[in-house]
Amino acid sequence: MSSQDPLLEARLQREARFHDAKYSGADLYPRHYAARPTQYVYTQMRDGLGDLHGKRVLEYGCGEGWITRDLARLGGQVCAFDISPQAAENTKRLLAAEGLLERCSVDVMPAESLLYEPESFDVAVGFAIIHHLDLVKALAELHRVLKPGGVGYFAEPLATNPLIELYRRMTPQFRTTDEQPLVLSRLPSLLSSFRSFEHREFYLTALAAVAMTYAPGGSRVFPALSAPLHRLDQALLRAVPRLGAWAWYTLLKITK
């Protein structure tokens, strides 16, 4: 985790400690996670990946390893990494149990200083990870390791809904001090070195279904309530794209 930048080094150490605790079983998940609300966003991302046979895939922030497992099942030769040694260990354990470890490598390293060769990946994937990073350094590294024409898919929380920001301020125990959800208006400058990017937003009116998970029995009704709201959201966002700034999540597709 060594870095020549002492501020970045301190940040990396804080992130590693937080996520080591999280993946060691500490109660660091909000209540609404029991309803798995981000599964809908992940499904959209996974479906966009298509067949990964013959492709080298880089996974950012492997966490518990379930995305790593899916990438391997889709045929990818996966290189996964995390800042947390505990996350890397959990991922290796899951892959070994499912007979997929030979298709994957799992390492501990910072996204701001990757140990991979230039232009060595066809695809990069990350879920709720890049908002934890020094974006300028991490995106420069992403550009370096992607092949020409390579694609990065990242699902990330957004920063500009005031109700979500209020909730975040009220629940600091569930997040790190350094994380910074994304702002859509900043994407063009952040991604200027890439050939193109596109994004789709999720959870506008469907945030009401997430809020319901805090009511008694709310997690049980979440699937039935969220499905029509997702359809409404997509119609609203097609009609008025600028409403995306008020959404909870964005799904980025970045092409080198």
Question: What label would you give each PLM region?
Answer:
Residues 58, 64-113:
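Class I SAM-dependent methyltransferase SAM/SAH-binding core
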Residues 136-151:
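A short glycine-rich, Lys/Arg-flanked "PGG" loop and its adjoining helix->strand segment in the class I
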Residues 201-256:
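A C-terminal cap/extension of S-adenosyl-L-methionine-dependent methyltransferases
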